[in-house]
């Protein structure tokens, strides 16, 4: 059992002068991961709320104070199961008051493939007005990989689709430095790492009505098992054309699951015709 953070929030309100009580609503919540055999559990922001109020007539359950505790349901729950041949899991995150619904899904079949999917849906614009947006990333990694000749293999394919979403070049550049780029290119353990992956994607691809994204991805390897891998993606924004070419080059020995030596290079190139800019 590992705790990721502790949230303590306070939103005081005052009475309206008509005898209504002023209150101090406290919120205590935490995010934690737990492992029980083959089952992994991730729970986000579960805890309790405490409403501390001061009735104008002094008729509280603690004299002049009224204390009302309550349960705060989690904002997200994830489950992951490793049952040998078949591995899978999912994560769901809901914020109805903000119109945000996010989820991740993973499915692995030993000796065949691993499928990961991430979806972000909003029904409100950032200003609170009604508006729909969607961001989906789907990746598939093959096991064993497809042989391409000369020691090269096709390890995986994937894609990104965004409706009413845009890409922020500066955030994409930051993702290269912070390694958040791996939240886009063939992310691993999408259920266990769902809160961080979703947060990264929301920052890089915010809502913008009338803007669309499309991005094919591929993962190429060399060696068997792959000693060197190149994860490459091209993200295209329309109609305000902006193109991002991003990649992760890795060399691991003897393999990624038990790496004694790991070298990694993240890179990004941006083509912005409107700004007449090409950067790498």
What are these regions (language model features)?
Residues 1-280:
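Extended assembly/interaction regions that build large supramolecular complexes
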């Amino acid at each position: 059992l590992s705790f990721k953070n502790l949230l303590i929030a306070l939103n005081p309100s005052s009475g309206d002068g008509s005898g209504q009580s002023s209150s101090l609503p406290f919120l205590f919540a935490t995010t934690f991961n737990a492992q029980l055999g083959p089952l992994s559990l991730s729970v986000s922001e579960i805890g309790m709320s405490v409403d501390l109020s001061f009735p104008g007539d002094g008729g509280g359950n603690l004299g002049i104070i009224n204390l009302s505790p309550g349960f705060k349901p989690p904002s997200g729950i994830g489950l992951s199961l490793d049952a040998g041949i078949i591995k899978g899991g999912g994560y769901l995150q809901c914020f109805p008051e903000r119109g945000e619904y996010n989820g991740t899904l993973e499915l692995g079949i030993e000796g065949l493939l691993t499928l990961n999917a991430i979806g972000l849906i909003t029904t409100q614009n950032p200003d609170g007005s009604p508006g729909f947006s969607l961001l989906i990333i789907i990746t598939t990694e093959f096991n064993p990989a497809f042989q391409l000749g000369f020691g090269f293999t096709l390890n995986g394919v994937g894609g990104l689709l965004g409706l009413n979403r845009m890409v922020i070049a500066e955030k994409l550049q930051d993702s290269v430095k912070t390694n958040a780029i791996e939240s886009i290119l063939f992310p691993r353990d999408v259920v266990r790492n769902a809160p961080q992956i979703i947060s990264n994607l929301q920052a890089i691809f915010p809502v913008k009505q009338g803007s669309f994204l499309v991005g094919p991805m591929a993962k190429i390897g060399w060696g068997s098992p792959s000693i060197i891998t190149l994860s490459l993606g091209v993200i295209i924004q329309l109609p305000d054309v902006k193109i991002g070419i991003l990649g992760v080059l890795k060399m691991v020995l003897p393999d990624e699951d038990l790496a004694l030596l790991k070298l990694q290079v993240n890179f990004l190139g941006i083509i912005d015709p409107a700004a007449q800019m090409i950067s790498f």
